[in-house]
Structure formats: C-alpha cells, structure tokens
Amino acid sequence: MSGLRTLLGLGLLVAGSRLPRVISQQSVCRARPIWWGTQRRGSETMAGAAVKYLSQEEAQAVDQELFNEYQFSVDQLMELAGLSCATAIAKAYPPTSMSKSPPTVLVICGPGNNGGDGLVCARHLKLFGYQPTIYYPKRPNKPLFTGLVTQCQKMDIPFLGEMPPEPMMVDELYELVVDAIFGFSFKGDVREPFHSILSVLSGLTVPIASIDIPSGWDVEKGNPSGIQPDLLISLTAPKKSATHFTGRYHYLGGRFVPPALEKKYQLNLPSYPDTECVYRLQ
C-alpha cells in the first residue's frame, strides 16, 4: 500500500478500467527501399554486406577506441545514444497512436551508462510530447549522473520512490516501459532491487523498449526466459544477443561511428537516410 500511496501522491494513478495501450501502429518511417532486408541477422546495407553483430569483447573494444583513439567523451556519446533511443521510440510508438494524451512512459534506469542513456532518453521523450516518469533506485554519486538527474527534475519529470510491485499496476499507469537497466558490459547475477524489477517486467502486457541489450540477457546468447521487449534499440552496432530478439521493432541508433573505425571492425553499418539518427533493422 505504501507504493500505491506514493504513486497516488504523484498524481499518476488513473481511475477506471484498463484502456487499450496502442490504438494503431502508424508507420512514420520512410518507405522501405527495394534493397531493405527483412532477416534479423541478414539486415543488408546498400553495399549488400550484412551488418555485423558484435560479441561482448568486440563491443568493449569499439567503445574503448571511441573514448581513447577518437577522444569522444562519455557524456557526448550518452547524449547521442539517448536521443537515438527517444527517436526510435517516437517512430515505433508515435504519440498519436497511444491512448493517453500525453502518452505515459516509465523509464527504469540502472546504475551504469545504460541508465544514463535512459535519463537522456526520458528528457528527449518529454520534448517529443510524452509524459515520462523515471525509476532510478541506484544512483551513482558522480557529476555526470547527478547532472542528468537535475536536468530531468528541472523539466518536471517525476522520479518514483518505489517500483510498483505488481505488473498490473504498471499496466494501468503506463503505456510503455523503457528498460535502461543493464548494458553490454554487465556480467554476473542480477541482484536486488533489479531482480525484483525484472520479475515485474516479465509479467507486463504493455510493450517494453530495451536500450542496447534487454536487461538480464547474456550479451551473446540472449535469454529465452527473460524479459521479451517489443522494441530493441541497438547502439553503435547490434550485439550478438539481438539475433534472439523476437519483438516487432529493431532499430540501430548512435550515428557517431567514424568511417575508419567502422572499416577496422568491419561493422558494415547501414546508410542512415538523410539526417536520421536511427535506422530500422527490423
């Protein structure tokens, strides 16, 4: 009951029976060119080469080169990644297709850089016309993350004190959940409070959008018994676990890879159309 009172205090609990979450899935993407591939692992670039799916070791090596060789900063890449995530969400679930106005979104952030991507994503979702709420149970005491929290607070984005304990409560309150808990560098067992959070997410009927890796999945092998997102936003390049993704929408985001780095790792990234920062792989 304390969790319910917290939610009521935020003015987020909506009376009445459960509403349908998505009334239509309107396509906002450009018409697919004739060379567009439909197979998950066989997504083709214009040159005909398959986009490379990275192992955990390869993903870490690419990240380190971006930071060390190319002198990108963490906050710079985080901003670009978070914007890509919000853009992909707006394409898959445009506000006009949702039953609430503005559409309600719960963004669950973990303690690492994936959580930082989620904070940036929430800020851009607010600018795109959504009503995000953030649950951020383990906050790092670092200037980068405290700054991101302040930015969200200044934009009147609420932070939950407790995670709704039952899937039905989340289904009633929100039309979409963004999973920004763990990224590709996560290893080991999932500990509390995130084990309980993932248990709640596994029982949802509203769609889940996972950033880079569905939380709780092995970076290369996936997890058939874990959460099953409807949208996956791969960042920089897809990871091998994405071959096990069975949802409706798979976007590639993070249009910041230097051509020389792409060539070195044979990423075969697609040609993003015009000024787009995301590319639909599936």
UniProtKB/Swiss-Prot annotation:
Alphabetized UniProt keyword annotations: Isomerase, Lipid transport, Metal-binding, Mitochondrion, NAD, NADP, Nucleotide-binding, Phosphoprotein, Potassium, Secreted, Transit peptide, Transport
Transit peptide: 1-53
EC number: 5.1.99.6
Tissue expr: Detected in testis and sperm (at protein level). Expressed at high levels in heart, liver, kidney, and testis.
UniProt-recorded name of the protein: NAD(P)H-hydrate epimerase
Binding site for (6S)-NADPHX: N113, N114, G115, G116, D117, G183, F184, S185, F186, K187, G188, D189, D212
Annotated PROSITE patterns: YJEF_N
Quaternary structure and interacting proteins, as annotated: Homodimer. Interacts with APOA1 and APOA2.
PTM-bearing positions, type Phosphoserine: S43
Binding site for K(+): N114, D179, S215
Main location: mitochondrion
Post-translation changes: Undergoes physiological phosphorylation during sperm capacitation, downstream to PKA activation.
Domain of life of the organism encoding this protein: Eukaryota
SUPFAM superfamilies: YjeF N-terminal domain-like (SSF64153)
Localization in the cell: Mitochondrion; Secreted
Family, as annotated: Belongs to the NnrE/AIBP family.
Modified residues (N6-succinyllysine): K138
Biological source species: Mus musculus
Note describing how the cofactor binds: Binds 1 potassium ion per subunit.
